[in-house]
Amino acid sequence: MEVQKEAQRIMTLSVWKMYHSRMQRGGLRLHRSLQLSLVMRSAREVYLSAKVEAHQPEFPPSRRALDPRLHPPREAEVAVEVASPEAVQPPEPMDTQEEVLRVQETPALCDPPPARVSRKRRSSSDLSDGSDAGLVPSKKARLEEVEGEATSEVPDRLQLPPAQSEGAFPNLARVLQRRFSSLLNCGPAVPPPTPPTCEAKPACRPADNMLNVLVRAVVAF
């Protein structure tokens, strides 16, 4: 039956290829060679499969499958299955587990806390070694040093720099003062005597007023 089915399949395939390759150049000749190769391959496969089936030996049932020691009876298996659920202990409820955890945690909570190490510095008098007494300064000495530094910084802050006291242009103010002072000093050292009837007025009073006004204007600028 298998050979007949294979022959029918080859014939159907050959007819289909001949119909589709009739319009091709050299199609029939090519199809004949392909058909011959297909027939030979199919015949070889059928022959080899039949030969293998004929020479295949029949293996007897293995002794391992028939050994009763390896395959215990079904009743023993059922007994083991029934006994196994009883051997397994049921899990404890959640309430009992929480109580056990609380009992285990309470001793840890009741333990006394460890003694804290004091971080207070010891004074120089508490040190046992006399050579180390000078290395640790006392608190009073530090306070005195801080107070001395604070008092020295306050006057420095109160004192204004020379640039601020003289104005925005200190050099210009100095130059103007020198020029006006030189102009005022050019006059006679001793003023001429004035008659007693006239009121004695200083000759440099207007120049001094002008100098003061200019200096104030420059300093304000």
From Swiss-Prot:
GO terms for cellular component: cytoplasm; nucleoplasm; nucleus. Residues 105-155 are annotated as: Disordered. The modification N-acetylmethionine is found at residue 1. Its main location: cytoplasm. Induction: By growth factors and cycloheximide. Pfam families: IER. It comes from the Eukaryota. Belongs to the IER family. This is Immediate early response gene 2 protein. It comes from Mus musculus. The gene is Ier2.
